[in-house]
């Protein structure tokens, strides 16, 4: 009944046992009957008080021992450090002083642990897209942290605080592409002509075109290593994207602003485990270098295959895989590797 009522869609991010807590009552009732049966059996041979004490002691001991005996072998995590290894591999995929966009908790919290507790690659600034809609989080991103400079965001506090530009509509008033930097300045402005009055509830910030671009300084991207010299002929004049949907969230707006304001100064990466919608059209300019995609001014048309984005820099990828990545003892035969880690 619970399964039918909740009707959860397939491929949940984790086993949601807590959703079925009500069904556990049935097992608890039968366990209670079992305890009562043992007490009834013993109290025929001794007084009820002693029978109750013995049954309670036996059950309190037998249940956890039985659980351990049945589950220890496939729950043993001794010597398994695959999670922290995976987090370090994410960070190792990034060039120095990089900005790394992540999305959920599973691809963010282990990275925070690696940086905060183990002091690993503190030059990389992790930007969690799920939190980027919060003004308090944007404040944090703009500040320097450890060895990482603040994230380049052009919006001021009064332009992104709670309740301001929580969403921005997309109105295709012009077809021609505009510089992403110019569009961000347009959205940040409080001039009356930058507001739309098409909606109930007052004026709303809007973007007047779907077609945006970031100009490319070819000399700069070659000098700072964004593009390798052997790929210089592939550099495009500008990175172009087309916005989808009818509006942008504050988080999406900040992503565009970061990419525009950065102006190819710092390396920018997106995590490999994110949904395609989070890439906002930049996936045509991705370069796989490990566990993250780097945004580069080289256009690669995506294949139809799922999660087949951009190009691969085989030299950097090979160096990361063979010389920088760690694997958390997964090759040790004594370490329990379950099917999640096999995948």
Residue positions per predicted region:
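Phosphate- and divalent-cation-binding pockets in alpha/beta enzyme and binding domains
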Residues: 109-113
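ER/secretory pathway lumenal C-terminal domains and tails of membrane proteins involved
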Residues: 1-21, 26-97, 114-343
């Amino acid at each position: 009944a619970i399964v039918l009522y909740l009707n959860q869609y397939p491929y949940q991010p984790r086993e949601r046992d807590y959703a079925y807590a009500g069904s556990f009552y049935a097992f608890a009732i039968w366990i209670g009957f079992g305890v009562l049966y043992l007490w009834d059996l013993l109290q025929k041979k001794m007084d009820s008080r002693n029978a109750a004490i013995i049954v309670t002691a036996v059950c309190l001991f037998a249940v956890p021992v039985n659980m351990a005996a049945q589950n220890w072998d496939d729950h043993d995590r001794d010597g398994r450090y695959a999670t922290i290894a995976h987090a370090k591999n994410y960070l190792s995929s990034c060039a120095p002083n990089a900005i790394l966009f992540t999305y959920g908790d599973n691809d963010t919290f282990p990275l925070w642990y690696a940086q905060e507790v183990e002091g690993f690659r503190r030059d990389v600034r992790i930007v969690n897209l799920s939190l980027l809609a919060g003004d308090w989080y944007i404040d944090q991103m703009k500040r320097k942290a450890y060895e990482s400079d603040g994230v380049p965001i052009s919006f001021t506090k009064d332009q992104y605080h709670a309740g301001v530009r929580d969403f921005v509509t997309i109105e295709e008033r012009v077809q021609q592409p505009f510089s992403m930097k110019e569009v961000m300045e347009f959205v940040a402005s409080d001039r009356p002509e930058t507001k739309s009055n098409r909606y109930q509830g007052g004026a709303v910030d809007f973007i007047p075109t779907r077609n945006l671009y970031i100009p490319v300084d070819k000399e700069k991207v070659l000098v700072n290593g964004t593009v390798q010299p052997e790929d210089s002929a592939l550099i495009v004049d500008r990175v172009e994207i087309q916005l989808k949907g009818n509006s942008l969230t504050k988080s999406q707006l900040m992503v565009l602003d970061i990419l525009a304001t950065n102006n190819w100064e710092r390396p920018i990466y997106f995590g490999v485990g994110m949904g395609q919608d989070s890439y906002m059209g930049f996936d045509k300019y991705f370069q796989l270098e490990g566990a993250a995609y780097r945004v580069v001014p080289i256009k690669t048309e995506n294949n139809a295959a799922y999660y087949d984005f951009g190009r691969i820099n085989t030299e950097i990828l090979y160096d990361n895989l063979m010389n920088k990545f760690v694997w958390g003892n997964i090759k040790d035969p004594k370490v329990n590797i379950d099917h999640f880690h096999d995948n």
